[in-house]
Amino acid sequence: MAQKIYIPDTLANWKWPPHLNPHYPEVKRESAAWLASFGAFSPKAQDAFDRCDFNLLASFAYPLAKKEHLRSGCDLMNLFFVIDEYSDVAEADEVQRQADIVMDALRNPHKPRPKGEWVGGEVTRQFWELAIKTASPQSQKRFIATFDTYTQSVVQQAADRTHSYIRDIKSYFEVRRNTIGAKPSFALLELEMDLPDKVIEHPIIQDLSILTIDMLHLGNDIASYNLEQARGDDSHNIVTIAMNQLKTDVAGAMKWVDNHHKELERKFNESFEKLPKWGEPIDSQVARYVDGLGNWVRANDQWSFVSERYFGKKGPEIMKSRWVTLLPKERTEDIGPQVVDDSLL
């Protein structure tokens, strides 16, 4: 009899309900066509990639964004997963080369990319060339700084994978806070804002940011674990790490995640009530920014079940029952998402 996995409902009491940006259908068409134009994946993998619908993730994550800012969000989500899919099957030195290309493209968005270069360079350049047309200077500065940190963490993840290195919980959290790509995503919450460094760097804002990131990566890991273990790429997943460190099984690891998530939620709500005041117009911008953090947690969870990324067409059903069947090992070296049991690796 096939083994069943229970996925805890970590957001049962989360006070942010899901909201979808009304520009989603139009912007999805634009961003999806833009990404497909690069031919980054085989036709089969491109079809699977389209079914993941990362534009839906952006539209849940930025429900109040103007059309042009939602386009930046959609393009970014698609860029993230181009980077992920190529780096997931590459050695650390190749991933470092990809990271260097991405950062050069971000810092020089108007400079043509070299002929024959890895496709991620031009995807990055075009994304950023369009985004900066409507992005505030502060959001641009923070985006580039946080994206640099993100790309280097992806290199570290590749090195860990190459050496079959399974981290302990503490060091995993430190690395995962960057590999999930949340910090650059938060910079897009600021596209219309002009928040000074002293505000973003305030301890309470920083605490809220880290707590949000930790809830995001825990939610992502419990949703993606089944596919990642089937792919043989689960060493960078909290379920595997908790099983290894706590000497427990999948059910025990999921229970640990659920309990830890509840503690993160409690701390987030406490810090949310302690937001400092700077006066207007900063206070209104901070309120929107922090509300955006809370919404991101819900957006990630909603997309995980509504899209076909992790559960195929069974997502809404699994969102209610919380039970999934453990998938068999299906190791693949192909670039791009693969279909396994109607879900997408």
Swiss-Prot record:
One of its GO terms (molecular function) is metal ion binding. Its EC number is 4.2.3.135. (2E,6E)-farnesyl diphosphate binds at residues 309-310. Mg(2+) 3 binds at residues 220, 224, 228. The record marks 81 as: Plays a critical role in the stabilization of intermediate cation. Keywords: Lyase, Magnesium, Metal-binding. It comes from the Eukaryota. Pfam families: Terpene_syn_C_2. Coiled coil: none annotated. It is an enzyme of class 4 (lyase). Its cofactor is Mg(2+). It catalyses: (2E,6E)-farnesyl diphosphate = Delta(6)-protoilludene + diphosphate. One of its GO terms (biological process) is isoprenoid biosynthetic process. Residues 277-327 form the Myb-like domain. A motif (DDXXD motif) lies at residues 84-88. Mg(2+) 2 binds at residue 84. InterPro entries: Isoprenoid_synthase_dom_sf, SANT/Myb, Terpene_cyclase-like_2. Mg(2+) 1 binds at residue 84. Terpene cyclase that catalyzes the cyclization of farnesyl diphosphate (FPP) to delta(6)-protoilludene. The DDXXD motif is important for the catalytic activity, presumably through binding to Mg(2+). Belongs to the terpene synthase family. This is Delta(6)-protoilludene synthase HETIRDRAFT_454193. It comes from Heterobasidion irregulare (strain TC 32-1).
